Amino acid sequence: MTTILKHLPAGQRIGIAFSGGLDTSAALLWMRQKGAVPYAYTANLGQPDEDDYDAIPRRAMEYGAENARLIDCRKQLVAEGIAAIQCGAFHNTTGGLTYFNTTPLGRAVTGTMLVAAMKEDGVNIWGDGSTYKGNDIERFYRYGLLTNAELQIYKPWLDTDFIDELGGRHEMSEFMIACGFDYKMSVEKAYSTDSNMLGATHEAKDLEFLNSSVKIVNPIMGVKFWDESVKIPAEEVTVRFEQGHPVALNGKTFSDDVEMMLEANRIGGRHGLGMSDQIENRIIEAKSRGIYEAPGMALLHIAYERLLTGIHNEDTIEQYHSHGRQLGKLLYQGRWFDSQALMLRDGLQRWVASQITGEVTLELRRGNDYSILNTVSDNLTYKAERLTMEKGESVFSPDDRIGQLTMRNLDITDTREKLFGYAKAGLLTASSATGLPQVENLENKGK
């Protein structure tokens, strides 16, 4: 069976991930007119720029959908977002600022839940609006086939017939109007935006040029913290975790993770927390650029890692960062549910996140400027008295440290011999450039 269909399968049911925007509206109407039987599926991901979800399926029916369903994906999306925080599943960072993989998380949820809904309706052909140059076409492909092994893929944007007739937004708008729908193109922005409850992605158009900065972006989850005319008073906030799970903000306990994430977004968004400008490597190895918002994810991540560093030992923290970066890359590639990702997730959640219990107090200022004011946890292995510089009872004595330093002589001696060996091989010389003149007789030993 051919998995990818290059041309419209007339007479067959096709499920389309329907956003209600111009592209998917025109595609749905075009497919209906060409003889297909389109079914529309809309994911409610809590997008901050969507005002009326209930209206989207109604529009789909007007454009010719055989049926239209709204699938509430918010609970699952937040669950996966919290799992990503617990695992540190983020691999793209620039200057200490993190991209929280909010779009890949959204695709993991959408790609599985919508295809599962289609399968319930006997729909085994799926289309969406992803283009052949991006990451989403592969993410949706993987998640769709994981959910339904019998799935076939039809994307209007890979169909030359569709492209020849409706190859651009102007043509799509004219097509909708000609068919009796008063569909006006929205005002063109200088960039494209995709969002869900966890974060927003701004990319393409003017943002493809690196001399266009964050200053051209109008945040949808935060504020223009770079604009001095925007007043942003400092704010203290406390975040509480229990066994790796965020449960309270400013003393308010949440039993609903969706409401907790919305409140975290509101708090962080008031300051523009979590905005970052990243150059990243797409799945196909070409570089792209995006400006990201994720105020709630950033707030929870900061508090989580503060507790992490105070609770776990150095080697565990190192493994958390190493495995988290690996997991973040798998998530980015659309492999969040692959076996290697599940293995990494299980270890990080079981042995790292389970011990993260406590409360962190921060002061948020402008953008990513913040201070940590207090850290409280019964699980802290940070003990001030162990290394206090004040006089008093200590957990070890000067003689203990002398013994420990004496034991270091073994590896120091070995290291000196290695340096002499490198000099003999011509790899090192006793020059100021190498910083080795302090090692006595190095040049002589190397001869």
Curated annotation (Swiss-Prot):
L-aspartate binds at residues 131, 135-136. Gene3D superfamilies: 1.10.287.400, Argininosuccinate synthetase, chain A, domain 2 (3.90.1260.10), HUPs (3.40.50.620). Its EC number is 6.3.4.5. Pathway: Amino-acid biosynthesis; L-arginine biosynthesis; L-arginine from L-ornithine and carbamoyl phosphate: step 2/3. One of its GO terms (biological process) is argininosuccinate metabolic process. Its main location: cytoplasm. InterPro entries: Arg_succ_synth_type2_subfam, Arginosuc_syn_C, Arginosuc_syn_N, Arginosuc_synth, Arginosuc_synth_CS, Arginosuc_synth_type_1_subfam, AS_cat/multimer_dom_body, AS_multimer_C_tail. Belongs to the argininosuccinate synthase family. Type 2 subfamily. This is Argininosuccinate synthase. The gene is argG.
